[in-house]
A protein has these predicted regions:
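Juxtamembrane regions of bacterial inner-membrane/periplasmic proteins
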Residues: 2-435
Length: 435
């Protein structure tokens, strides 16, 4: 097969067999002269580049009872390189990938059997997928159960270019993984989500490209907007606006925590129930409206992954969160201190010290209950803080429910009395430069 695109000319060779009687197909594709195949036209159409050494595919079709169809086969690729800016800023490389599959197809069902095997560099697992249509509504199930295996099989199999912070990391010990996602679109509230990566004698022997414990000491944080750096400052005593955790009002600390992640000091980086609730809500409104992120996840996203907003970032984020929390690379107290010192509280307003001055001309230790609850409320959308105010400069009435909720939690935690909580209203005076 001769392929010509602009100035690039390729000579491909395809071998294989098609046997209609045996209902079997197998084929292999490679370039002559030990060169890589470069898929044509996708660069011009999608801005992507895909090259590989060899591609192999086979399929056998088998008719079963009740109009059931079974497909068995194998797909294999070697020397795969992929580049697209939506995936990674670098070329993604996969030495070898292989799928040995059994697929069952019915009138209203499609199932990837659990005997299916995925080989991904050094790691192997058996996924299960099922899609069933019932009365115009779909029911999807996906599951993976991977029993104990060497930890370095996972971290040594991560494709180069896709997990830049983890490239070169060396580990020891064993891991086991369980995943389940079950979505019945006729009953979204019944959605099930389970994800657990367990460890046995796990240790990081050598960091990869990034020292994952860097938050434990003073480090330079860079804030980005639209992929461009806008400010850099050290998170430690050398920054004049840095505020130690014990110099921040307990009311502010608890208000933010109860608003963003009330179980922060008790979980290990993930809250599956929060992710489940976010998935249900997103599916109900048919858009990405909630993320279910913990404070650890937000920190990792901002400190380690800020520049790489792409499809693979969530996977890398999850792995880094798991490593930091499992290995206790940074204490919870220090993580929360970092969080409050890098949080954006307005246009180019970073950290609680700048926020306290910007809104109330105060130091973080002087914030009142009402001021603390207000600052907690704007963390999700700091650039739109003015939407919280009416034309007369007072907080809008629709803030009352939020104030009541957080005040109640402050009372439960013993920071204010029940009587004080009942008197809390969305009433603040902005004396800084914000308005």
């Amino acid at each position: 097969i001769k392929i010509k695109e602009d100035t690039l000319t390729q000579q491909w060779k395809a071998t294989g067999e098609l046997n209609r009687k045996a209902r079997m197909l197998k084929t292999e594709l490679f370039a002559t002269g030990k060169k890589k195949i470069s898929l044509p036209y996708i660069n011009r159409r999608f801005g992507a580049e895909v090259t590989f050494d060899t591609l192999y595919y086979s399929m056998t079709e088998e008719n079963l009872a009740n109009n059931q169809l079974r497909l068995n086969g194998k797909a294999r690729v070697s020397g795969l390189d992929i580049f697209h800016k939506a995936l990674s800023p670098e070329v993604i490389h996969l030495d070898r990938g292989q799928l040995t599959y059994q697929m069952n197809i019915g009138n209203h069902t499609l199932e990837l059997d659990s005997t299916t095997t995925v080989l991904f560099n050094k790691i192997q697992f058996h996924p299960y997928l099922r899609a069933e249509k019932k009365e115009a509504q779909w029911h999807f199930t996906a599951a993976i159960d991977k029993s104990w295996f060497p930890a370095d099989d996972l971290f040594g199999s991560l494709p180069k270019g896709l997990f830049s912070n983890l490239e070169g990391i060396k580990t020891r010990g064993e891991l086991a993984y369980h995943f389940l996602l079950d979505i019945d679109f006729a009953q979204l509230d019944s959605l099930r989500f389970e994800s657990e990566l367990k460890e046995k004698d796990f240790r990081i022997m050598e960091y990869g490209a990034t020292p994952l414990s860097k938050m434990s000491e003073e480090f330079t944080y860079t804030a980005y907007e639209n992929g461009m750096p806008v400010r850099s400052f050290p998170i430690g005593p050398s920054w004049e606006h840095f505020t130690p955790l014990d110099s921040i009002s307990p009311l502010l600390r608890m208000s933010v925590m109860q608003s963003e992640d009330g179980a922060f000091f008790y979980h290990k980086g993930f809250l599956p129930d929060a992710i489940r609730e976010a998935l249900i809500y997103d599916l109900q409104v048919k858009r990405f409206a909630r993320g279910g992120s913990t404070i650890t996840m937000q920190l990792v996203k901002n400190v380690f992954l800020n520049r790489n907003k792409n499809f693979a970032r969530k996977l890398e984020e999850a792995l880094i969160v798991w490593l930091i929390e499992t290995e206790r690379l940074t204490s919870k107290e220090r993580m929360y201190e970092v969080y409050l010192n890098i949080a954006e509280w307005g246009p180019l307003v970073y950290g609680i010290r700048e926020a306290s001055a910007y809104y109330f001309n105060k130091r973080p230790s002087q914030l009142t209950t009402e001021e603390s609850i207000f600052l907690a409320s704007i963390i999700p959308k700091p650039k739109h803080f003015r939407n919280s105010f009416a034309e007369n400069g007072q907080l809008k009435k629709n803030m009352e429910g939020y104030y009541k909720l957080i005040a109640g939690r402050l009372a439960q935690k013993g920071l204010i009395s029940e009587i004080e909580a009942d008197t809390i209203r969305p009433d603040i005076q902005v004396t800084g430069d914000a308005l």
